């Protein structure tokens, strides 16, 4: 693909030049080619976007629930019509295989938007009788202008996960995509406008997180920030949001999730789940089950099943339908993952497979890392303690249910957890003791629109998807009505 035209900001229904004068480049990680130069939003651009959003939000909130629902449903239709076009752009920008982006990223994002479009008429208040002449009623009102700050691993899906409930509740959103993968969020803005969204209701500001993101979190005109990213950045976002204007926040901050295989499990099923929990999207999924606990007596058999499945991984041309494994999203990220792999070797973990870059067959110029499985791991190892966000699985052994529950919970993170077992009683008994916000039994990874997702501990605050997320983009107003004569004590 030839280099794209310089990408601008999207404010008030159209493209506009950034006032900052700064730009950055977005790279195709499969081959290192520059996809586009992108303009970076500065402080004045954030001010412009907020003013635009304030104007648009008043128009949007004044529409009926059915009017808003119809517009969002039109956006869903356009997303599905352009699924392949958007998936190709997502593959170029992220490096993910087209077989994945064309069946997951836009599809699931559109599902979430359709879900919230259908929920809009269900945003209701309540009536509370107090006595014969006195009652209270409540209204759910939009927050106003909110900000979404996205991560680089699921660019358009995250933009939809954040904008869908916000817009459904009558808010306007200013979205800052990751500077690593900014392209499809701009296309989403075009689609919203084409569907009939009033100008200003969805503005997109590409830029560097430490600048553009900080300006958004500090701006007094923004009522809430929804952030997806790392813990350190999340703490800064939360601190800035509180210090500026006590903004509400939703935080999704990653994890180091346990996958527990019990001795009664079907090891073929367990191996299939472990593969998806570690190598889907080349390991760049926040919920990945990178700490795989297996009974000591099952370790050797489990390892053989994993090795057999690693052989089925197909890296190569990301647009080949048979390719199911792409490069990492960027060269700096690849280098960071490789540093973790070196650390694992130094600390005594045994490499079962992988452990280096992938080369040959057109891969030499890309950010490729081989699917890597470490075994003979221990809880104190760096690769077991820290989030790597790459194709790196750690296999650990255990002896008892009590032991594995304790060790699974021995982490600052609490985003996800899963177990594989044939015993239904054990499944629920153990899941109820795991300190994680998203749990799977005999499966892994699916996050449907109806399912609230989010973390415990350092993995986040608040939830995305589900009914409760729609409500989190509203504020409740209570109105007391007295029908009798008011009695004053004076």
Swiss-Prot record:
It catalyses: betaine aldehyde + NAD(+) + H2O = glycine betaine + NADH + 2 H(+). Binds 2 potassium ions per subunit. It is an enzyme of class 1 (oxidoreductase). One of its GO terms (biological process) is glycine betaine biosynthetic process from choline. NAD(+) binds at residues 150-152, 176-179, 230-233, 254, 286, 387. The modification Cysteine sulfenic acid (-SOH) is found at residue 286. InterPro entries: Ald_DH/histidinol_DH, Ald_DH_C, Ald_DH_CS_CYS, Ald_DH_CS_GLU, Ald_DH_N, Aldehyde_DH_dom, BADH. Pathway: Amine and polyamine biosynthesis; betaine biosynthesis via choline pathway; betaine from betaine aldehyde: step 1/1. The record marks 248 as: Seems to be a necessary countercharge to the potassium cations. K(+) 1 binds at residues 26-27, 93, 180. GO terms for molecular function: betaine-aldehyde dehydrogenase (NAD+) activity; metal ion binding. The active site is at residues 162, 252, 286, 464. Its cofactor is K(+). K(+) 2 binds at residues 246, 457, 460. Keywords: Metal-binding, NAD, NADP, Oxidation, Oxidoreductase, Potassium. Its EC number is 1.2.1.8. Involved in the biosynthesis of the osmoprotectant glycine betaine. Catalyzes the irreversible oxidation of betaine aldehyde to the corresponding acid. Dimer of dimers. Belongs to the aldehyde dehydrogenase family. PANTHER family: ALDEHYDE DEHYDROGENASE-RELATED. This is Betaine aldehyde dehydrogenase. The gene is betB.
């Amino acid at each position: 693909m030839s280099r794209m035209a310089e990408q601008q900001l999207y404010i008030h229904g159209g493209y506009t030049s950034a006032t900052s004068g700064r730009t950055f480049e977005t790279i195709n990680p499969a081959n290192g080619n520059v996809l586009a130069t992108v303009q970076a939003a500065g402080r004045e651009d954030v001010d412009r976007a907020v003013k635009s959003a304030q104007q648009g939000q008043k128009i949007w909130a004044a529409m009926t629930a059915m009017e808003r629902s119809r517009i969002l449903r039109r956006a869903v239709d356009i997303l599905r019509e352009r699924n392949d076009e958007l998936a190709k752009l997502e593959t170029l920008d992220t490096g993910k295989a087209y077989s994945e982006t064309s069946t997951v990223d836009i599809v699931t994002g559109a599902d979430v938007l359709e879900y919230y479009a259908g929920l809009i008429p269900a945003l209701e208040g309540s009536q509370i009788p107090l006595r014969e002449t006195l009652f209270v009623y409540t209204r759910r009102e939009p927050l106003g202008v909110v900000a979404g700050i996205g991560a680089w691993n699921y660019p358009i899906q995250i933009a939809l996960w954040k904008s869908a409930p916000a817009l459904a509740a009558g808010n306007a959103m200013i979205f800052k995509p990751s500077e690593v993968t900014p392209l499809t969020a701009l296309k989403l803005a075009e689609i919203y406008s084409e569907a009939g969204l009033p100008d200003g209701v969805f503005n997109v500001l590409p830029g560097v997180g430490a600048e553009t993101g900080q300006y958004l979190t500090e701006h007094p005109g923004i009522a809430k920030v929804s952030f997806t990213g790392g813990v350190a950045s999340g703490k800064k976002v939360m601190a800035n949001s509180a210090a500026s204007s006590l903004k509400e926040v939703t935080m999704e901050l990653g994890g180091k999730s346990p996958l527990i295989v019990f001795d009664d499990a079907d090891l073929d099923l367990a191996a299939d789940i472990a593969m998806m929990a570690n190598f889907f999207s080349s390991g760049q999924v926040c919920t990945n089950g990178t700490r795989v606990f297996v009974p000591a007596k099952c370790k050797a058999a489990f390892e053989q099943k994993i090795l057999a499945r690693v052989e089925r991984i197909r890296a190569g041309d990301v647009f080949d339908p048979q390719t199911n494994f792409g490069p990492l999203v960027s060269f700096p990220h690849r280098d960071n993952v490789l540093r973790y792999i070196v650390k694992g070797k130094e600390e005594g973990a045994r490499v079962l497979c992988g452990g280096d870059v992938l080369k040959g067959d057109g891969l030499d110029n890309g950010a490729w890392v081989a699917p890597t499985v470490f075994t003979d791991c221990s809880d104190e190892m760096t690769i077991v303690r820290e989030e790597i966000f790459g194709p790196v699985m750690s296999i650990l052994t255990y002896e008892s249910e009590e032991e594995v529950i304790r060790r699974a919970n021995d982490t600052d993170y609490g985003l996800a957890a899963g177990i594989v077992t044939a015993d239904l009683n054990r499944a629920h008994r153990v899941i109820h003791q795991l300190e994680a916000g998203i749990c799977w039994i005999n499966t892994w990874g699916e996050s449907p629109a109806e399912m609230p997702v989010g973390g415990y501990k350092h993995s986040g605050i608040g939830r995305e998807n589900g009914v409760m997320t729609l409500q989190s983009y509203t504020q409740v107003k209570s109105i007391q009505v007295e029908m009798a004569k008011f009695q004053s004590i004076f």
